[in-house]
Amino acid sequence: KVRRAQDAVLRTRPFSETLQKVLGGLIKRLKADAIDLPLLTERTVKKVVLVVISGDRGLCGSYNNYIIKKTEARIKDLKAEGLDVELVCVGTKANVYFRRRETPVRKFFNCPQAPSAENASSITDELLADYLSGEVDRIELLYTRFVSLISCEASIRTLLPLSPSGLETDGDEIFQLTSVGGQFVVKSETVPVAEPEEFPADMIFEQDPLQILNAILPLYLNGQLLRTLQESVASELASRMSAMSSAS
């Protein structure tokens, strides 16, 4: 199951890299033309939505506890700045925990064991609509990054607004589960930042570049969320495998 989760991440990477290059190039071109891009505009932050990815079940060591504690710490920091915070919970464990403590939960989604583009799209469509309407000023992803079969790391990534380049891949790692001497080991490879595609100044687009950007952005955001779902599921599976091994 961990191998399948790994393969899912690796299969989507070439498409993601190409999409990031085109996206970066379009943003660069539109900025040069002084076109306003709402998804890149930093605005006064009043409300922050935290998308918290946890599991639907227990018996997976401290996997759920780590992400819940990370979320509580982030909520505390944001409230100390005088900001309103709401949650979008992906996974039953976080949803039940925070609702019992009367933390505002905006929406709940089950966490699929084999995340698909459709799963991610159902979440990102709502998040994007809320951001563009001005109802939400910042959206962050809280997920569990896969480090090794016995180690995972609760992490935070900003989904919206986008960074000035539109790219959020710096420091990304791809994990690969391999077998050495009959034992499972995890090898990780740091992913280089995808440099923006350089479009010639006299290049003519069949469609307006802004229309192209508006069509690509949902795909990009969907890919970012799908990646975090896949990483979280792999971390949960590894934590469950480790917990079962310790119990036996």
Which stretches of residues belong to each language-model region?
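C-terminal beta-strand-loop-alpha-helix "lid" module of Rossmann-like NAD(P)-dependent dehydrogenases
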Residues: 1-248
